[in-house]
């Protein structure tokens, strides 16, 4: 008999999967952890994990944690603006402000300049792209100038953490000193 089931990254499971899990572990208690803003599957559209109360009805409590220890205050303020939130607080001290630029012209030169500047003060730098195709394109653009750069995609077995290009859906759980999106 399994008494306690812990599910992490709850936002990456759909409601059918939760019904199946609940029916497999009929006599178990559940602890379900997640963040709807970190979903990697665009088809799972939870407004809140509180929606899971429909499935886990017995003695169900919903708690929302509003402090983060991972990201700096500037990153949290920036993402709060994008997500329309204002209740998430950063515990980590101030760091550099996010820098936003949009460019297709001189993309290679801009990326090389930014990577070199970031590498001066940071051990690891990641370029996070929308998908494998975009990651491969950026890798092809930079590989001759940056011999230590690696491409991490769904087929990769290992990668160089110091300088990596990675699609967003494979970046989950990884941490880098600096990130270019």
Which residues are covered by each model-predicted region?
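Conserved helicase motor core of SF1/SF2 NTP-dependent helicases
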Residues: 4, 11-181
């Amino acid at each position: 008999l399994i008494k306690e089931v812990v599910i992490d990254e709850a936002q990456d499971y759909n409601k059918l999967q939760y019904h199946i899990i609940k029916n497999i572990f009929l006599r178990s208690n559940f602890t379900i952890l997640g963040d709807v803003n970190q979903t990697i599957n665009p088809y799972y559209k939870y407004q809140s994990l509180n929606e899971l109360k429909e499935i886990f009805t017995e003695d169900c409590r919903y708690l929302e944690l509003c402090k983060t220890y991972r990201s700096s205050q500037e990153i949290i303020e920036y993402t709060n603006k994008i997500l329309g939130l204002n209740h998430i607080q950063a515990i980590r001290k101030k760091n550099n402000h996010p820098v936003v630029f949009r460019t297709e012209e001189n993309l290679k030169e801009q990326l090389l300049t930014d990577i070199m500047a970031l590498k001066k003060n940071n051990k690891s730098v990641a370029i996070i792209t929308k998908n494998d195709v975009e990651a491969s394109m950026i890798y092809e653009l930079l590989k001759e100038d940056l011999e230590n750069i690696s491409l991490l995609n769904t087929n990769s077995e290992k990668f160089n953490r110091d300088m990596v290009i990675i699609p967003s859906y494979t970046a989950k759980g990884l941490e880098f000193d600096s990130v270019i999106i």
